Amino acid sequence: MSELRETRLEKANALKEQGQEPYALRFDLTDRMARLQADHADLAKGAERDLKVSVAGRVMTRRVMGKLAFFTLADETGTIQLFLEKATLGDSFAQLSSLVDAGDLIGVHGILRRTDRGELSVKVSKWEMLTKSLQPLPDKWHGLADVEKRYRQRYLDLIVTPQSRETFRRRAMAVSAIRRWLDERDFLEIETPVLQSEAGGAEARPFITHHNTLDLPLYLRIATELHLKRLVVGGFERVYELGRIFRNEGVSTRHNPEFTSVEVYQAYADYNDMMTLTEQLIASVCEQVCGTTRISYQGVEVDLTPSWRRATMHELVQEATGLDFTSFETREAAVEAMRAANLPAPDKADTVGRLLNEAFEHAVEPNLIQPTFVLDYPQEISPLARKHRSKPGLVERFELFIVGRETANAFSELTDPLDQRGRMELQQERRAAGDVEASGVDEDFIQALEVGMPPTGGLGIGIDRLVMLLTDSPSIRDVIAFPLMRPEG
C-alpha cells in the first residue's frame, strides 16, 4: 500500500510540474450522469450528438489501448463512459493515460456519442484533474468484503457499493417523509436539550458528562419525552422532535449507543389515536420510499398496509405458552409455571408483571413478523404511562413489532402529577438499589404536570430500525453512516 501511495504522490508532483494543479478549487458542471443517460437514450449506436457537455466525478475503471482509452466516470447519480483518443486530445492524452488512476476525481468537456456496442459516452475534448487520490480503491469486482471495514471506512463503502449509497438515500427520504407527514397535519417540530440535568423518559443507562463552569453533572438525553410533554403543558397541542438519542448500553445488530428517534405528542388523544397515527404514518413513509406497502425483508414478505393486528400482551403470551398470567397471585406462582414451561425467570424480574414481560420477550417477540400492536403493559415497567381505564395493574401502552423487532412505543400519557410522583419515587428506589436503568424524580417535570397537562397521546418511533426494514438491512450498522466502533489495535 505504501508503494502505491508513493507512486501516486509522484504522479501528483508530475502534474504540478506540467502545470496541472492536482487539487482544484472548482469545476463548472453542466450535467449529471443519470440525466445524460435519460435524456439521450435515443442516440443511435455509432452516432454523435453535437452537444457540449461538462461532467465531473470519480474514475472507477480505466482501459488504455494504444491511442484510445475508455474510463468509467461516476458521480452521485450514476456512471458514464469516457471515450478518449489521442487524435482529439493531443499531448494531454499521454498525460491522462499515465497520470490518472482509478479513484481520481476529474472533470471533462466534450460531446456525446454512442459506441458501436451501445454505450453512451462522452467524447472528451478537454480534461482537468480535480483531486488526485493517493489511496487505491478496493477491488472493483469484490468491493469491501470485510464487513467491519465497511463500517470503519464508510467513505470507501459508499464509493464502491451502490447498495450502500441507496440505503442512505432511502434513509434521507424516510426522514423527510416523516417530517412532511407530521408537518402537513399541523404538528410542530421543536428542539429540546441534548444535555440534561436529569436523565428521564426511558429505562436506560445514560452517558454522564460534566459542565466545568457550572460544576454540574449532566446527562446526554435518553429520550425527548419529558421536555416535549412540558411543551404540551405550555400549549403546543401537536408537537414532535426527530433527533439523536444516547444510551450507554450494548452494541448489537439492533442497538447502537447513538441512534435516532421521532417522538410525537398530540393533546386530547389517547393510545388508540396513536395506533391509527402510527400505522398511517409508517405506511405512508413506506409507500414514498419503496413505492409500495408490501415489501420483502430478509426473504420474508411483510405487508404494511393498514389496518394492523392488535392484541394484548396477556393474550399473546397465553397463545404462545399456555400461561395465563392473570391467574398468578404471587411471583412465586409465576416463576414455578414459567420454569415448567422452560421459560427463564430471572431474579431481576421481581414482580408478576416483569415476569410477564420476560415471557413475552422470549416466547412471543421473535415471532411477530407482520406488524402487530402489542397492548396493555404491566404498570411497573411503564412509569410514564396512564393507568388502564378498565384493567387494574396495567397501563394504556402499546409497542409496535415488525419482523420480530420493537419499532415504536406509545402511551396514553400519565397526566396525574401525584401518580407520576409516586411512580418516579419507585424508580428512584430501584436506582438506589443498583438499577442503573432506573430514573429519579424530576421535580421540574412534576411541577409542570401540576400546572396541568391535557389528556395526551405520545409516540416514539425508532428511525434506524424503520430504515432497516425499508432497506432490507440485517444490521443497524448498515443504516447508520458512521456507527460506533471499538478503536482498532
From Swiss-Prot:
Pfam families on file: tRNA-synt_2, tRNA_anti-codon
Record text on cofactor binding: Binds 3 Mg(2+) ions per subunit.
Protein name according to UniProt: Lysine--tRNA ligase
GO cellular component, one term: cytosol
Keywords: Aminoacyl-tRNA synthetase, ATP-binding, Cytoplasm, Ligase, Magnesium, Metal-binding, Nucleotide-binding, Protein biosynthesis
Binding site for Mg(2+) 2: 406
Family per similarity comment: Belongs to the class-II aminoacyl-tRNA synthetase family.
Uppermost EC category: ligase
Catalytic activity of the protein: tRNA(Lys) + L-lysine + ATP = L-lysyl-tRNA(Lys) + AMP + diphosphate
Matching Gene3D superfamilies: Bira Bifunctional Protein, Domain 2 (3.30.930.10), Nucleic acid-binding proteins (2.40.50.140)
UniProt-listed PANTHER family: LYSINE--TRNA LIGASE, CHLOROPLASTIC_MITOCHONDRIAL (PTHR42918:SF15), LYSYL-TRNA SYNTHETASE (PTHR42918)
Chief location of this protein within or outside the cell: cytoplasm
EC number: 6.1.1.6
Binding-site residues, Mg(2+) 1: 399, 406
An annotated GO BP: lysyl-tRNA aminoacylation
Cofactor: Mg(2+)
Family annotation (SUPFAM superfamilies): Class II aaRS and biotin synthetases, Nucleic acid-binding proteins
PROSITE patterns: AA_TRNA_LIGASE_II
InterPro entries assigned to the protein according to its UniProt record, in alphabetical order: Aa-tRNA-synt_II, aa-tRNA-synth_II, aa-tRNA-synth_II/BPL/LPL, Lys-tRNA-ligase_II, Lys-tRNA-ligase_II_bac/euk, Lys-tRNA-ligase_II_N, Lys-tRNA-synth_II_C, NA-bd_OB-fold
Record's subcellular location: Cytoplasm
Gene that encodes it: lysS
Record text on subunit structure and interactions: Homodimer.
